[in-house]
Amino acid sequence: FLASGATSIILEKFDEEMAFSSIEKYKVTHSQWVPTMFVRFLKEDPSLRTQYDLSSHQVAIHAAAPCPVAVKEQMIDWWGPILHEYYAGTEYNGITMINSQEWLDHKGSVGRPLFGSLHILDDDGVELPIGEVGGVYFGGETATTFEYHNDEEKTKSAMTDQGYSSLGDVGYLD
């Protein structure tokens, strides 16, 4: 967003009321959150929800931790279908994205890959069928071009013979 000339508002310390005040004051259109912030918003006095004009808010992106289904449902009920979730790592070996409507149809999902492919493998590197839990692996160009800084062994351990890479997370495809 910065490259496009957008203004960034960065709070020195997260505070629920300051976040709402900033959205109103600066007419924030896009924001980035973590699920813990949503939990804190929802624990606030419900009257706080109507004190601020959040109508400028068009896109609320969240990531960095799993978001409990009940929390995300409440946030969509409150803010509307502006929530977008992504799953990725700083290694940038892959990324998934899901919008509010897709998520409501597949609660708990983190979406589809934006590029490349997504695979669920067992401990032997065998692809698992839909619904079975295993290691999450990305395939494609970014999956094979990332590396851990000054750690060739760690980089090798994240790769498979098929050219897939993993952050070490587990999941399943639906």
Where are these regions (language model features)?
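Short beta->alpha connector loops at strand-helix junctions that form conserved
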Residues: L11-E12
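Alpha-helix capping/helix-boundary segments
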Residues: D15, M37-F38, C67
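Acidic/polar helix N-cap motif
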Residues: D15, D122-D124, D151, T155
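Short, P/G- and charge-enriched loop/turn segments at secondary-structure junctions
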Residues: E102-S109, S157-M159
